Swiss-Prot record:
Bound cofactor: record note: Binds 4 Mg(2+) or Mn(2+) ions per subunit.
Free-text comment on this protein's domains from its UniProt entry: The large subunit is composed of 2 ATP-grasp domains that are involved in binding the 2 ATP molecules needed for carbamoyl phosphate synthesis. The N-terminal ATP-grasp domain (referred to as the carboxyphosphate synthetic component) catalyzes the ATP-dependent phosphorylation of hydrogencarbonate to carboxyphosphate and the subsequent nucleophilic attack by ammonia to form a carbamate intermediate.
Catalysed reaction equations from the record: hydrogencarbonate + L-glutamine + 2 ATP + H2O = carbamoyl phosphate + L-glutamate + 2 ADP + phosphate + 2 H(+)
Organism: Mycobacterium bovis (strain ATCC BAA-935 / AF2122/97)
Cofactor annotation: Mg(2+); Mn(2+)
EC id: 6.3.4.16, 6.3.5.5
Binding site residues for ATP 2: R729, R768, L770, E775, G800, I801, H802, S803, Q843, E855
A single cellular component GO annotation: cytoplasm
Chain segments carrying region Carboxyphosphate synthetic domain: 1-407
Binding, Mg(2+) 4: E855, N857
Record-given protein name: Carbamoyl phosphate synthase large chain
Alphabetized Gene3D superfamilies for the sequence: 3.40.50.20, ATP-grasp fold, A domain, ATP-grasp fold, B domain, Carbamoyl-phosphate synthetase, large subunit oligomerisation domain, Methylglyoxal synthase-like domain
Keyword annotations: Amino-acid biosynthesis, Arginine biosynthesis, ATP-binding, Ligase, Magnesium, Manganese, Metal-binding, Nucleotide-binding, Pyrimidine biosynthesis, Repeat
Lineage of the species this protein comes from: Bacteria, Bacillati, Actinomycetota, Actinomycetes, Mycobacteriales
């Protein structure tokens, strides 16, 4: 059946900002879909609020709307296209995660799709409802001959209590229509039931929750299926969770294909999955079904289904080489599976199910260290911020590779000291699921626990425990062997052990370098295998490789020779984490595509299954490998061999993937690997405070006073000389890890005690903290001679809030022409002083007309995608070309950069773009169930970002808030409680809110000051003050929890009562999903946003249209 001829214009909805539970896997799927639809001659409109995505680059759609993903904004897009005589025929919402699906459902139910004649494709409304609505899905499972957990959908707390009495405790609480398990959990007591179900009823857009029997401890499996309009169904992949039920699948280590299912169990699961898919009615696309198996009696139940492309779909795509999103998009426009050719083989159709001759392991990356006080227990609510994936010829090889891919402080077994305690302590820790469980499993086995005892304590299947036990046995052999011979070393490498791990067991080999030289001497190198979807039955056309150490010394590598073009290796950024996310992947993808077009063979090395960079057709070759020195060096050697007799490897790019590749630059250069762009010595110069300070002094550029300390006494002396407040931090960090603003000696002592353990080989830096300064961020290019300013951003929050968490505006809103010229001159001096070839990011603080240099990073920054979208200049592409020898003058002549001028001075008619950070506070709870503090500081906490772009600052800021957190209130009550130093600055914004008709609530001191300034307000007492006669009966926290407050303005100060009170206020706001503003500047911006919303003139415009207005570079 050829594609439908009645479809001409398709609207694709993306997934918005990166949040826990919904990450860049949807950029990967959306990018594939847009490419496919346009290749089929269809017109594509795209709505996505996330500027860091590849899919929002103007070349992927005809009309790219970087707008909030809400029903109201999407309706404006549909209406605008209809008004222009360019009617949208269909809406594809199955590739943008839960956000897109919920938006599509709302548009259908409100009649918008019917009004404009837009058809839902991929999955129709009924299929979405049947798959997502818990009760309807349960009925379908029964009809298909399957079984669900005993459960009931409840709409009120009374129904919840009645159901719990019937099922008995513990129970699982699950809201409908949410993603990443948000609001779900296992309740062991009636108090926990009340708390979770109450929160669940609030979290679910349909205001109902499912209460089900607990199947905690059962084995969990997933099937990834696809179905076409002719009822052909393929099972793309089976996935097994190593962690048992009770841990969200996104937080579990997972394996593909499933390892512990019998053939009979698998066939039963497969038959049931296909029957459910048909009953639900997903007739043109992909879906994911989760199952649980009772390990004691084999009882199989169906947990849930996602009638859309999901996180697991991205994993299954990368694991098998079967491009699920791409095929889903083709199925949605009418093709059948037998008509679609498998890209990887070039000859088999998509109705051939993938076959794997390797094992894939995915492991989650957490960030609990960023949220002090958060409960680290793993539950049914997802908490991981990223993931890594690896491929190997056996389970333990893939496991070893994925553990070192995570880049945590422990790079695999035996690379860090064991925790205190013996077997019993390890087994006790295993009973509560937490990050790093694999280490406790290995430790318990090594200390003598049996496989059965460890399986009983952890709930992990004995097969996986036995595999880790084999590693423990191998460790004993490695330690005991008199000499490490070729056979034993080869077995160790075949079992996934790194040189670093082997070196930790054999001290006489003098570290990792000693193991490497022994390996080289014995001729032990990895071979590179190919992901081909068919277990080598057909030849692969796409070079997608993974390494393996074969036991047979004669095993051959599958990397084909390529001698025509010079090669460039691009090192990706590894698993997403706070501080290093999709923004860096964006730059890597741009480098791959632009250098390929410029005549280079591009080679991508990365291990993140969610990203566009690890798509098999982004670079000319892909290596799915850990980003460690050992693994990258082996890839380099493989590429040198494959290019032997040709131009060879021109160099390795380390400055686009964030701190991970930068950290490898020196060791790679020392090993003879050519690094292109800014040399490693220059990177060091920018990181070394002494050398960088000298550079600034020579250029006459002021910087905040600072000192370097290795002891508390030194830090105290420096702080006294500089004057409090001071900013303290370890050196060499990304995302402000371990940074704090310290107001007194007592807090300083506490910090030094904690932070010096964080990076023992580097001292602590103590800087003067510039209060009330305006922070400025600059992205620039330098070719060694000329400097091109990409964009100058003004932060909305004051200096002291991490740049990744601060909202910022481009072009700057309050900076004058002379300020901008100061910034330009300083940036030029720094670029030349460091010796930058490529991108440079500099952060400044402007205070009392003095421009202070805070830091400079000679690499791609996380703002590069935002600046590129806002200015229409592809900075990452330009950077890649400059690193490989192009000049800025040459790129101007080619039209890649503006012919004259640069991004320092925006055109008069340029729109204002606002970037806002998206923070995951609502995902975390303290152990007692309380919310964690939403206070911002110098340590980065955001997981993603959105962009609002419009004619004026107020409208752009309002859009950014709507996209990140939901609309700012247009009326209602605002609660104000601020530190004394902020009271004067807040008079004007609060007065404006009162004039707009808002009721103002305030605590006693703030209320008194507001009334003195003619602002009517009502008093509430502070949370820690007791209720007394003559005082307000309601506290601020009571008012927020009672739903009487629509917005909170709360600025904190110090560590005493007000600080604690502030924590309670902000936590209550987070729990109630109420806008909570913690800075004066944020309050002023919010007022402008509210005014823009009340005026009602916030429209939508595509990037293509905006870029024409800017007069930007059209590509």
């Amino acid at each position: 059946m050829p594609r439908r001829t009645d479809l001409h214009h398709v609207l694709v909805i993306g997934s918005g900002p990166i949040v826990i539970g919904q990450a860049c896997e949807f950029d990967y799927s959306g990018t594939q879909a847009c490419r496919v639809l346009r290749a089929e001659g269809l017109q594509v409109s795209l709505v996505n609020s996330n500027p860091a995505t590849i899919m929002t680059d103007p070349e992927f759609a005809d009309h790219t709307y970087v707008e909030p993903i809400t029903p109201a904004f999407v309706e404006r897009v549909i209406a605008q296209q209809a008004e222009r005589g360019n009617k949208i025929d269909a809406l594809l919402a199955t590739l943008g995660g839960q956000t897109a699906l919920n938006t599509a459902v709302a548009l259908y139910e409100s009649g918008v799709l019917e009004k404009y004649g837009v058809e839902l494709i991929g999955a129709d409304f009924d299929a979405i409802q049947r798959g997502e609505d818990r009760q309807r899905f349960k009925d379908i499972v029964a009809k298909a001959g399957g079984e669900s957990a005993r459960s009931r959908v409840c709409f009120t707390m009374a129904e919840v209590r009645e159901t719990v009495a019937e099922l008995g405790l513990p129970v699982v609480v699950r809201p409908s229509f949410t993603m990443g398990g948000l609001g779900s959990g296992i309740a062991y007591s009636t108090d926990e039931v009340d708390r979770m179900a109450g929160a669940g009823l609030a979290a679910s857009p349909s205001a109902n929750v499912l209460i089900e029997e607990s199947i905690y401890g059962w084995k969990e499996f997933e099937l990834e299926l696809m179905r076409d309009g002719h009822d052909n169904v393929v099972v793309v992949c089976s996935i097994e969770n190593v962690d048992p039920m009770g841990v969200h699948t996104g937080d579990s280590v997972t394996v593909a294909p499933a390892m512990t299912l019998t053939d009979r169990e698998y066939q039963r699961m497969r038959d049931l999955g296909i029957a459910i898919l048909r009953e639900v009615g997903v007739d043109t696309g992909g879906c994911n079904i989760q199952f649980a198996v009772n390990p004691r009696d084999g009882r199989l139940i169906v947990i849930e289904m996602n009638p859309r492309v999901s996180r697991s779909s991205a994993l299954a795509s990368k694991a098998t080489g079967f491009p699920i999103a791409k095929i889903a998009a083709k199925l949605a426009i009418g093709y059948t599976l037998d008509e679609i050719v498998n890209d990887i083989t070039g000859e088999t159709p998509a109705c051939f199910e993938p076959t794997l001759d390797y094992v894939v392991v995915k492991a989650p990356r957490f960030a609990f260290e960023k949220f002090p006080g958060a409960d680290p227990t793993l539950t049914t609510t997802m908490k991981s911020v990223g993931e890594a994936m690896s491929l190997g010829r056996n389970f333990v090889e893939a496991l070893g590779k994925v553990m070192r891919s995570l880049e945590t402080t422990r790079a695999g077994f035996w690379t860090a000291p064991d925790p205190d305690g013996g077997i019993e302590e390890a087994l006790t820790r295993l009973r509560t699921p937490a990050e790093g469980r694999l280490y406790d499993i290995e430790l318990a086995l090594r200390l003598g626990a049996t496989v059965e005892r460890v399986a009983e304590a952890s709930g992990v299947d004995p097969w996986f425990i036995a595999q880790i036990n084999e590693l423990v046995n191998l460790r004993n052999e490695l330690v005991a062997a008199p000499v490490l011979n070729a056979e034993l070393l080869r077995r160790a490498k075949h079992s996934g052990l790194s040189d670093h791990q082997i070196a930790s067991l054999r001290p006489e080999l003098a570290g990792e370098a000693g193991v490497r030289s022994l390996r080289v001497r014995l001729g032990i190198h990895p071979v590179y295998k190919t992901v081909d979807t068919c277990a080598a039955e057909f030849e692969a056309q796409t070079p997608y490789h993974y390494s393996s150490y074969e036991l047979d010394p004669a095993a051959e590598t599958e990397v084909a020779p390529q001698t025509e073009r010079p090669k460039v290796l691009i090192l990706g950024s590894g698993p997403n984490r706070i501080g290093q996310g999709i923004e860096f992947d964006y730059s890597c993808v741009h480098a791959a595509t632009t250098l390929s077009q410029a005549g280079f063979e591009t080679v991508m090395v990365n291990c993140n299954p969610e990203t566009v960079s690890t798509d098999y057709d982004t670079a000319d070759r892909l290596y799915f490998e850990p980003l460690t020195f050992e693994d990258v060096l082996e890839v380099y050697h493989a590429e040198m061999e494959s290019g032997s007799g040709g131009p060879g490897v021109a160099g390795v790019i380390v400055q686009l993937g964030g701190q991970t590749p930068l950290g490898l630059a020196h060791r790679l250069a020392d090993a003879g690997v050519p690094i292109v762009g800014t040399p490693p010595e220059a990177i060091d110069l920018a990181e070394d405070r002494g050398a960088f300070g000298d550079l600034l002094s020579a250029a006459g550029l002021p910087a905040p006073k600072y000192g370097t300390a290795t002891t508390f006494a030194q830090a105290r002396r420096i702080a006294e000389e500089i004057g409090y407040p001071v900013l303290v931090r370890p050196s060499y960090v990304l995302g402000g890890r371990g940074m704090e603003i310290v107001y007194d000696e007592e807090t300083l002592q506490g910090y030094i005690t904690r932070a010096t353990q964080l990076s023992p080989e580097h001292p602590v830096l103590v800087d003067r903290f510039l209060e009330d300064a305006v922070e400025i961020d600059v992205d620039a290019l330098c070719d060694g001679a000329e400097v091109y300013i990409g964009g100058i951003m003004e932060h909305i929050e004051e200096a002291g809030i991490h740049s990744g968490d601060s909202a910022c505006a481009l072009p700057p809103v309050t900076l004058g022409r002379s300020d901008i010229e100061k910034v330009r001159k300083a940036t030029e001096a720094i670029a030349h002083g460091i010796g930058v070839v490529g991108l440079l990011n500099v952060q400044y603080a402007l205070k009392d007309d003095v421009l202070y240099v805070l830091e400079a990073n000679p690499r791609a920054s996380r703002t590069v995608p935002f600046v590129s979208k806002a200015t229409a200049v592809p900075l990452a592409k330009a950077c890649a070309r400059i690193m490989l020898g192009a000049t800025i003058a040459q790129l101007r002549a080619e039209g890649l950069l503006a012919v004259t001028g640069d991004g320092a001075h925006a055109a008069r008619n340029a729109p204002i773009a606002v970037k806002e950070a998206v923070l995951p506070f609502h995902r975390f709870r303290r152990a007692d169930g309380a919310a964690i503090d939403s206070l911002l500081g110098p340590e980065m906490k955001s997981t993603g970002e959105v962009m609002g772009i419009d004619r004026d600052f107020g409208s752009a800021f309002a859009k950014s808030q709507t996209a990140a957190y939901g609309s700012l209130p247009a009326q209602g009550t605002v609660f104000v409680s601020v530190a004394n130093r902020d009271k004067r600055s807040l008079v004007f914004p609060v007065k404006r809110l009162a004039d707009l008709g808002f009721r103002v609530l305030a605590t006693e001191g703030t209320a008194e000051m507001l009334r003195r300034n003619g602002i009517p307000c009502d008093d509430v007492r502070k949370h820690f003050e007791p209720a007394q006669p003559g005082r307000p009966t309601m506290s601020a926290v009571d008012a927020i929890r009672a739903g009487e407050v629509n917005m909170v303005i709360n600025t904190p100060y110090g560590n005493s009562g007000p600080r604690i009170d502030g924590y309670e206020i902000r936590s209550a706001a987070v729990a109630g999903n109420i806008p909570c503003i913690t800075t004066v500047q944020g309050a002023s911006a919010a007022v402008q946003g509210i005014e823009a919303g009340i005026r009602g003139d916030i429209g939508v415009r595509s990037l293509q249209e905006l870029h024409r207005v800017i007069g930007g570079v059209e590509r």
